[in-house]
Every structure is written in C-alpha cells, then in structure tokens.
Amino acid sequence: MNAVGRIGSYIYRGVGTVSGPFHPFGGAIDIIVVEQPDGTFKSSPWYVRFGKFQGVLKNGRNLIRIDVNGVDSGFNMYLAHTGQAYFLREVEDVVGESESGEVYTLSSGDEAETTSRDDVVDKVKIPLKSRSCNYDSPSPRTGNGKIVGKPGILGYVFGGRSVRESQDCGVERAEIAADLLEVKWSTNIDTRKRGKGMSSESLDGKDYGESTSTSGKSCVEGSSEMLVDSDSILETPLVASPTLRFLDEKEQDFRESTNVEDYCEEDGSSGVVVENGLCEASSMVFSVTSEGSGNVEIFVEPRTEALAEDAVSGSDLDSKQELLRAPESVEIATLGSADQADMGSIGTSQEGSSTGSPVQDENKITIKDMHISAGDFEKSQSASGESILQPEIEEEQFSFSDLDECKPGGNSSVGSSSSDTVKVDGKESYDETKTSPEKGVENTMALSEPINIERKKDIFTDEMERLVGSLPIMRLQNNDDMDASPSQPLSQSFDPCFNTSKLDLREDESSSGGLDAESVAESSPKLKAFKHVIANPEVVELSLCKHLLSEGMGAEAASQAFNSEKLDMEKFASLGPSILENDKLVVKIGGCYFPWDAAAPIILGVVSFGTAQVFEPKGMIAVDRNEKPGDVLAQGSGSWKLWPFSLRRSTKEAEASPSGDTAEPEEKQEKSSPRPMKKTVRALTPTSEQLASLDLKDGMNSVTFTFSTNIVGTQQVDARIYLWKWNSRIVVSDVDGTITRSDVLGQFMPLVGIDWSQTGVTHLFSAVKENGYQLIFLSARAISQASVTRQFLVNLKQDGKALPDGPVVISPDGLFPSLFREVIRRAPHEFKIACLEEIRGLFPPEHNPFYAGFGNRDTDEISYLKVGIPRGKIFIINPKGEVAVNRRIDTRSYTNLHTLVNRMFPATSSSEPEDFNTWNFWKLPPPSLM
C-alpha cells in the first residue's frame, strides 16, 4: 500500500506541474538582449504562443499585454490566428527602388519569412474602375477558363444573380462602359428588366435611368471581366488604355474584339427632337472595333426621320440621359426614344430642321497618344430635347451651378462650320467638320462644376463626403427588388436645356475637384479622421487608458481599452483637478483619441467658439489599423457607399499596360521619383528604443504576457529576459541527455518527482558561472514545454547546490513537429545550429561569444563546431556519465571536471590569450598533419 501511495503522490505532483497557470498548448521562450558598444540593444526573437484555438477570436481582441519586472512595458504584442504573438512595426517601403522584389514580413513559425512582391501584387490586384459610376466593378477570379466576378454592388441591386454562366448567346443587354477595354468610360445603368415586346415606358421616375449598353445578341469569349445585369452577363476582354478614334461612317454593327470574331449589332433610334409642331426621331447606328494594336474605332451614322405631330409626346419618352462634364471626367450619353426602349447607345442627339436630313455628313474626331488611367478623365456628351421630365417618385435633386444661364428652347447659331476640340494633357487638336449653314446646327461645349451633395451622417461616412467631387447622372434600380431594397436608389433629374450635342475630352490636372490617386494617397490619414471630430465636437469622453493605447492597434481594441478605464461622473468628481496631471488621461473627441495636452486647445476652441476647425489634429493617437494592399478591395457586401472603388492602382497593373500606352506617360513614370510608402509589417523583436524603455537590469528579468478573452478568461505565460554585454562569453549546454541521464526519460521522470539528472552537473556549471561565463540551456523541445523545462532546471539541486540561472532556449515549433524532428528524423541539430547562429548575430561580428559546449550526441558536436566553438571546448557525455573531450582525452565525469574548471574555464577577467593558455596549448594533442 505504501508503494501505491507513493506512485499516486508522484502522479498527483506531475499532473499539478503540467496543469499549472500556463496554457497547455502555449508558452514563451526566454529572451536574450545584448547591449551593443554604441549603447543600442539587440534582442533574440520573442517567441510567445497561446494556442491555435485562439484563431476564432476577432481582430479587436488580440491584444497581449507585456509586463517586465511587474511594470507595464508601454507597448503590446498581437495574437495571430495561429496563436503566435507578434509586434506591429511601421516601415518605409520606397516604391520603385526595390530590385530584389522581396517584401520582408518579419514573421516565423507557420508563416513565411519573405513573400514575392509579384505574389503580393497578384493577391491585391484591383481592376481599374470607372470614376463616375456607383457600382462595384467585379474583381476577376479565374476558374476553369471563366472569369468569376466578385459580388459587389451590382449583385446587391440585381438580387445577387450568379455571375458564372455557360457560353450562351442569348444575352439581353451588354455593358460596354466602365470595364470595357478598361477605357474608363462613364457608365449609367438602367437595371429595369426589358422585354422585346415593350415599345414604350412611362416616365414615372422608376424608368429614369441611363444606359450605355447594347441590346442585341452577344456572345463574347476569352479571358474577360464580368459586368452583371439583371438579365444578362457580358464578358469583355481586358485590354487596358487603347487609343480612341471616332468616325462617322455607314457602319451598322457594334464590334468589339481582341482577335476574337464576336460582335454585337444594334440599329435603332437614339433620340427624339420636338420642334415647331413636328417630331424628328434621330437614329444612331454605331460600331466599335478594337484592333490588336490597341485602337478602338467608333463609327457613328446619324439618321433623322420626320414624325407626325401627335406621334410623340413628353410622356412617351423612354428616358433622358444627361451627363455633364466634370473635371478630369469624360462621359458619353444620348437621348433615348420610345421606339428603342431596350437600347442605350453611344452617340449624339442632333437637332435639325424638319427636312429629316442628317445634320452632319462626317464628324471625325481622333484621339491619339492618350494615356488612360483610373480617374484620368471622363467623357462628357450631353444631349437633350425640350421636354422636361417629372419623376413621380421622390428623388435627390442635384443643383448645378452652370444651369442658371440655360434657357429652354434657346438655340444659338454659329457660322457655316464648327470644330470639335479635343484637349489632352494641355494640347488641343482641331478637326474640321463639314456642316451645312442652312441647318443652323452647332456643337458647343458645356461645363459643369463639381456637385456638392449633402447627405445625412447615417447614410454617408466622412470618407464618402470627402470623395464627392463630381457625380454622374445615374440610377441603380431593379423592379424585382425595389420593394425589398432597404434604401432608395440614388437618382437626379433636371433639364440642362442643351439644344446641341457636345463632345468634350479634357484632362484638368489642376482641378481641385479631381480625385487623383496620388493626391488622395498623400493626404494625411489623421486629417481624414479629424473631419469626424469637426462634425461631432460635442462627443467628448474621458478615460485613464493612455498606457493601453498604441498606434495601429485597431479601432475595436482601442475602444475596449478606452471603455475599460473610462471615467464617469463619480470618478471624475473624486479625482478632482489632479486628473489633469495624470499621464494616462485620454480624451475621446468625436471618436478620436487625444492625450490631454493635445485635446486641451481643441476643447477650448469648442467651448469658446463652438467649432474645432481652427485646430489641426496634432497629437492624435492613430489607433486605426493600417490596411494592407489586399484590404483595399471593395467588399461585396452590397454597401451603398458612394465610392466603393480603390483609388490606388497596383504596381503590377501599371507595368502591364499594353502597347496602346504612349511613350509620353512612360517617360513620366520613369522620371518620377520613388515615393516612400509606410506599411505595417509583423516582427518578432521590438525596436532598440522599446528595449531601452524597459529599463532592464543586468542578468535576469521577469516578463509576463497576458491575454484576456470573455470565453476562456485571462491567460498568462511567463518568461525571462537576460541582459548581457556585447563582450560576454557563453557556455552552451544541452538539456536532455546532458543534464538529465537520458533523452526520453529525462523529460518524464522529473514530472513524477524522480531525480533523473547527471551527478555533479550542478557543481560544475555553478563553478563555470562563478568564473564570469554566461550559461545557455539549449533544447529541441517544443515551446509548449518551455515552462516545464524552465521549472525543472530551477528546481534541480544536488547536495544543496542549484543550477545557475540562464536562458532556456527551446524550439518555437509545436509539440508534434519537435518530436518528429528529434525522435523520427533524429536531426535536432538543424534547430540548434539555426538558434545559435541567431544568437551569435546579436553580438558584434568581430566577437564570437561562444566559448564551450556540453552535449550528449554527435549532432551536438556538429552544432557547436558550426558556430565556432573549438574542439577542445566541446564536452560529450555518455549515458554512463563519462565525459569525453575531443574524443581523445581521458574519460572523466562532471565531478572530475569540476577540479579542472579554473584551467578549462579561466576567469573572464584574465588577460591570458585563449589560444595559448595552459589548457588549449599544452593539454590538447597537436593537430594532425595528415
């Protein structure tokens, strides 16, 4: 019974040791910090793990608090989905200067150290978007030779229709704008279901939509980008930045190809003009051809037919398509008719006399040497009749500043000829057009200024308001989903009273309304966030949480930290005026966090003048997490935000421009200086400044990592930080089989309270420590065994002599990878060599810190020789406790070695040269000459 009781007590003590305060699948490895000759600090990696099941937690709950010697460190770590902790660090990446093509994400474990820049660009590749349409252009994803679009705003509006479909030529409508050849044309979408039998639609506001599309049969094959409609899917080849050429010829097909013989054909009425009691239906036949060279030809044939006076009325008009030219924008629109309810065309609505003859025989506009990028310009062509539309449903009315001088029915005549002006990059080119003087027709250019739209805060965010410069005339609507739609589609209606057609192509680089990608990228993120402060200055809260806040920690984590130390009226009254002297005081103004010294002038301005606009957001704690390039993709959640596109093009897309791009933009790109871009990377080591702020003492320091969740509560892992000088000498010792008697039993026997250590090991290592050497205990065990291993070494005593303290450096891998490497592959030296070389990198290059090594295997000798330990200082012990030096010295034990410590390990303060001391020069055999 006594034997059974003793076994039970051993098991109880072992279980109690295993189920201690540490996480069973987590742990932390001891850290080595080396002070450099210049006073800076270098640190070994901070390997901290809490277990992979933590990956189910949200991003806002991954904050790890660090306490060093019982004092908060002032900075935090973050928990990855793998359960491993990491630091966030901002680095400057100069675009255009990287020649290696590597993006270094300072991580380890299951994550790769480096990733190719091309792979990163592929992951965050963003298709170029139209700047004047409120819909998501799908992000292409290739699968089985088809392009599968990412569901975006169109999927939301059109009821989430599938974007994958077989090659079916029964396409009702085809979207030829925003993503067509990536030409950045403005697209106005009418999402109403159209049937072939429909001849007219009432103008009740629901039909008030614009479309730049075709309704014929279409079947386009090849690699393409999808545009989704309520009834159809169009796949258009991805050809970036072609040259445009507009020609008036007798062509009656709409052809779009890149060496693919597929086309859409359309012939129909494009406009209705009411004048002097007679109605003229102006039809437009057009064709677009894309050649392999990157040129796109648009052939336009205008037709005008006289109609009876009672044949057309204002209510029979299908829709009125109005597009005004905004800075850096180009749009093309037409005036639709009742005869062609299912057609949206690209053309010009022309107004002439009752003779019905075409007003233009030929109108040729050629645009060459034109670099088209995201948001560079929009095409604008406005056409209207004299009928003013009155939508029946409630709409958002937009005010345009240039409509005051517009008079209904006004028609001014110019000379016998007019010219269309094309202005690109500050250059103007004129192409004479042949017009008939008696027709009294002119081509004019109308300007519209940016539209400022005031919206409620609960509908549009501040970022949307900042991006609003100029808006298209557009509407997104689906009759099938109108009743279930949670928000009313955006629309506008007004009569600009333009009686003539216009085509204006401009690139106004100096326009303040343009949304240039570089200008947006260069704008201060703090200034963007501060706009919300200005809009909501009345929201002011106090909290003593400055020590918990850090830049880039995330808005949700910052909110939780703020609320945990938030002050209420009672706390504020109890603290009194002394609260202003508290360094932890943080003021939350309009959702932004300020320390008191930065918030004081803002609050003073709000109280005194009722506004915070007079102050800059200086000193604000930028808690918002910096987005990665992959995060700027517009999410397919069906959001109704005004600008769902990214304004920043990826580097790979810019480099992938075809031959259609001209030499001038390429020269500008080559001459442009590299721009430094800040990005956040993961790191396993803190900065030298952060290490200096810890105020470490020489030798051992305790560190605690704390992670809290509502599900599992507070978890904590402990480790130790050792601060050494740059000229320290290190003695490395293996654990399993070297300090213990065997590899396997040495791990389990101490768990049940049985001493399984080598005789005399504590006395030997203590004597080595007393001579000024630092000890490292190296083991290939898993990180989850860190606490057990550390506790075993601390509790190991022989004849009242304990082991000296030293960092326990073990494998950062999990339990099974470590066991597989050590037991199955029998290659623990792979980890040991990498670990020792990493520690050696903490010291100056001219100083080798490793002095001697103890092990029990030949692989240990290989590891020690690899890092520069001489053979005479490598001690290999066998299971019998016999120590061999260089395999040729008399066999000794740890006890016998203790008597030779002063000769084998002379005091570090001695000035005797290492290569010629009494042990290395006289006791070791001479090297072999063979």
Swiss-Prot record:
Q: Which SMART domains match?
A: LNS2
What does its pH dependence look like? Optimum pH is 6.5.
The record's keywords, sorted A to Z, are: Cytoplasm, Hydrolase, Lipid biosynthesis, Lipid metabolism, Phosphoprotein
Biased composition (Polar residues) is annotated at 346-360
Residue segments, region Disordered: 192-222, 334-362, 402-440, 653-684
Where is it localised?
Cytoplasm, Cytosol
Highest taxon of source: Eukaryota
EC numbers listed for it are 3.1.3.4
Stretches the record annotates as N-LIP: 1-97
Q: What biological-process terms (Gene Ontology) are attached? A: cellular response to phosphate starvation; galactolipid biosynthetic process; lipid metabolic process; phospholipid biosynthetic process
Q: What are its cofactors?
A: Mg(2+)
What does the entry state regarding organ or tissue expression? Expressed in roots, leaves, stems, flowers, siliques, embryos and mature seeds.
Inactivation phenotype: No visible phenotype under normal growth conditions, but the double mutants pah1 and pah2-1 show reduced growth.
* Pfam families listed in its UniProt record: Lipin_mid, Lipin_N, LNS2
Cellular-component GO terms for this entry: apoplast; cytosol; membrane
Q: Name one GO molecular function term.
A: phosphatidate phosphatase activity
Residue ranges annotated as compositionally biased, kind Basic and acidic residues, are: 422-440
Q: Which residues carry this modification: Phosphoserine?
A: 470
Residues covered by region (C-LIP): 730-885
Q: Which InterPro entries match?
A: HAD-like_sf, LIPIN, Lipin_mid, Lipin_N, LNS2, LNS2/PITP
Q: Which PANTHER family match?
A: LIPIN (PTHR12181), PHOSPHATIDATE PHOSPHATASE (PTHR12181:SF12)
What's the entry's take on its domains? Contains 1 Asp-Xaa-Asp-Xaa-Thr (DXDXT) motif, a catalytic motif essential for phosphatidate phosphatase activity.
Its family remark reads: Belongs to the lipin family.
Q: What does this protein do?
A: Magnesium-dependent phosphatidate phosphatase which catalyzes the dephosphorylation of phosphatidate to yield diacylglycerol. Acts redundantly with PAH1 to repress phospholipid biosynthesis at the endoplasmic reticulum (ER). May function indirectly as repressor of multiple enzymes involved in phospholipid biosynthesis. Is involved in the pathway of galactolipid synthesis in the ER, which is required for the membrane lipid remodeling, an essential adaptation mechanism to cope with phosphate starvation.
**What is the designated name of this protein?**
Phosphatidate phosphatase PAH2
Q: What organism does the UniProt record list as the source?
A: Arabidopsis thaliana (Mouse-ear cress)
Q: State the gene name recorded for this protein.
A: PAH2
